[in-house]
Every structure is written in C-alpha cells, then in structure tokens.
From Swiss-Prot:
Name of this protein: Glutathione-regulated potassium-efflux system ancillary protein KefG
UniProt source species: Salmonella gallinarum (strain 287/91 / NCTC 13346)
Keyword annotations: Cell inner membrane, Cell membrane, Membrane, NAD, Oxidoreductase
Leader sequence residues: none
NCBIfam families: PRK04930.1
Length: 183
C-alpha cells in the first residue's frame, strides 16, 4: 500500500479564535499524519516571514492547501505577503524556478455571504471561479496542478451539522488528496 501524499496546510486567519467554521475544518486535518498544519498568523505575528524555511516546507510536501477566509475578494494580508515573498523567482518561476512543478494547489475558502451572491447578476457581480482566478494563475505560474477549491459559503451562518459534514468530507479528502474524485 502506498503512502498518502504529504500535505502542507497553510492556514491564514487573522482572527482564528472567532472563526467557528475554520476551527471545525481544521479538526480533521490535525488528525492525519500526512498533514502538516502551518498557522501563518501564529508563526508570523510581526509579518516577518522566514522565506528559506517556508520554501523548504514547500519542497517537502506534495499538496499545498491554502485555507483562509475570503477577504475583499482575496486572502488575508499575511497570506498575500507570504505568496509574494515565498513564491519567488528561483523557486516558483524564472531560472531554476521549477521546484514546485507537478505539486498540487487547493484553496479552501470560507465566505461571509451565500453562494447566490457570487453570480454575474448578484451582489458580487462575479462567480467564485472568477474571484479565485488570481490564485489559479499563481498555481499556473508555479506549474502546479490547480485542484477545484473547497468553498464553505456563508460560513458563520452554517449549522453545526452542516459544518461537521464539510469537515468530515474535508478530512476524508486529506487522507488521500490526489485520488480520483475527492471532495
């Protein structure tokens, strides 16, 4: 039996203590031996990112999960800083920038609005696939495989049962993240 892929779960929430949905989603992740949960706000409260350390973590893992709330159609500030500093030339692009080729990228997003708000004729004017396009393009720049995102819409209004269902499916996916199908 082959080993499951090694997963680096980059968790970026500046107010993690207030996010019930993200705490529920993290529970199954910490139970898997193949998953490294890396809380960026806990590690870098001053925003001074240890780029060589972060790049070494990326090299050691097969699947990179970016779990965060959707903030102003993007990610929290520290994750944006992380993306700009860590996914630099020589690692992810440019000469020698082939170190992430073939790895997998998956975004796991919580939102404060319902799915119906993400349509061309709705409040946000664009579907979530358009909103997340910069992340998909970043994965392409790194020559990583873009996996369909996991999105928990209107996260703070979901029932405990619904959040538990999302967490269960997420945990099952984390156990074997590059299998066919998946969550």
């Amino acid at each position: 039996m082959s080993q499951p892929a090694k997963v680096l779960l980059l968790y970026a929430h500046p107010e993690s203590q207030d996010s019930v949905a993200n705490r529920v989603l993290l529970k199954p992740a910490i139970q898997h031996n193949n998953v490294t949960v890396h809380d960026l706000y806990a590690r870098y409260p001053d925003f001074f990112i240890d780029t060589p350390y972060e790049q070494a973590l990326l090299r050691e893992h097969d699947v990179i999960v970016f779990q965060h709330p959707l903030y102003t159609y993007s990610c929290p500030a520290l994750l944006k800083e992380w993306l700009d500093r860590v996914l630099s030339r020589g690692l992810a692009s440019g000469p020698g920038g082939n170190q992430l080729v073939g790895k997998y990228w998956r975004s796991v997003i919580t939102t404060g609005e319902p799915e119906s708000a993400y349509r061309y004729d709705a409040l946000n004017r664009y579907p979530m696939s358009d909103v997340l396009r910069p992340f998909e393009l970043t994965a392409a720049m790194c020559r990583m495989h873009w996996m369909p995102p996991i999105i928990v819409y209107w996260a703070r209004r979901q029932s405990p049962q619904t959040l538990a269902s999302h967490a269960k499916a997420y945990g099952e996916w984390l156990a074997n993240p590059v299998s066919a199908g998946g969550y």
